[in-house]
């Protein structure tokens, strides 16, 4: 193949990867800076006084969370929000440990409205949430996981966005708790979520967040629509579906859910494979959102922030290496240097993997390792989704103590 053609393909693939992971963030920040210059209006919503706060339903989906559930209840009871305006719904379908019993036996303070819904059959989180939506009696519903601790002011910060009738959903922030013991394991995961949080803040301010994480998000109850029972990442599909209707999804960094890091990168891989499979499934089911002429900025954000990471970027990575080898073999000095840098990066990732297996913690090597794991997960996810082997049931990753 002609050298010039190889060079064009090489740099095009480099651009895809760069844009998917860094370039979009740079471009978005630039566009946002221009918007700020042209707009003098303060877009930050004001907190509501107690008498104006809306009633909310706080939904906690739990499956075999006996180790966490009492902490979760205490966390809920500590919210800075009028108790007479919160309805707590705990759903524990399929749990066969002590989770339902511990909820029933928990000594609740007077005036707390907490209900437990339990079925022995396990049909997945989507089915459980859909079942209890019939019992929601408030205009706003907030969803969270049982093993995450939510910030005290979260509800108050979330509901202020609904003063704007165009807001259909609000995404909270996910934070990774790091201790000295698991600092190396969680380095890649923590940095990834910090960067994701920054992108979501900019997405929200520019136009709309493209999908929410299930650790903490909320919607207008009237906008709830059941998603197909085999949906893998229902939180993402649910909130993007609301955006597809013409509403915007806001991001609230002061409403955050704290979760322990995965016990190892290999444990995190389980989550990444499931999310990748779910992302590919979502792309197929949300095909209309790929039409930039119909959905404008929403499509631009969706393709740039999500679609490229789940499709073209992982494919481009091995092509970059192969094209780089071909160009370096032609004696081109620039490509020989770039090949050396690529090989050093992948060797660092392999070293991170080997050190993790030996329980040796070295944070610098976990970042390239984590990046490679993220992209490897897309291939595994693609294999699962095409073979129909990705279960809708959540496979819990072991968390650091």
Segments from the language model and where they lie:
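Acidic helix N-cap motif at the loop->helix transition within catalytic regions
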Residues: 68-71, 85, 97-105, 116, ...
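Membrane-embedded multi-pass helical conduit in multi-pass membrane proteins
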Residues: 3, 34-35, 48-50, 259, ...
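Short aromatic/hydrophobic "clamp" motif used to bind/position activated sugar donors
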Residues: 141
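Short, acidic, metal-binding catalytic loop of nucleotide-sugar glycosyltransferases
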Residues: 74-85
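Catalytic donor/gating beta->alpha subdomain of glycosyltransferases that bind UDP-sugars
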Residues: 162-195, 230-234, 239-305, 370-384
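Long helical/loop segments within the catalytic core of UDP-sugar-dependent glycosyltransferases
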Residues: 32, 111, 117-118, 126-128, ...
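N-terminal membrane-anchoring/stem segments of glycan-assembly enzymes
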Residues: 1-48
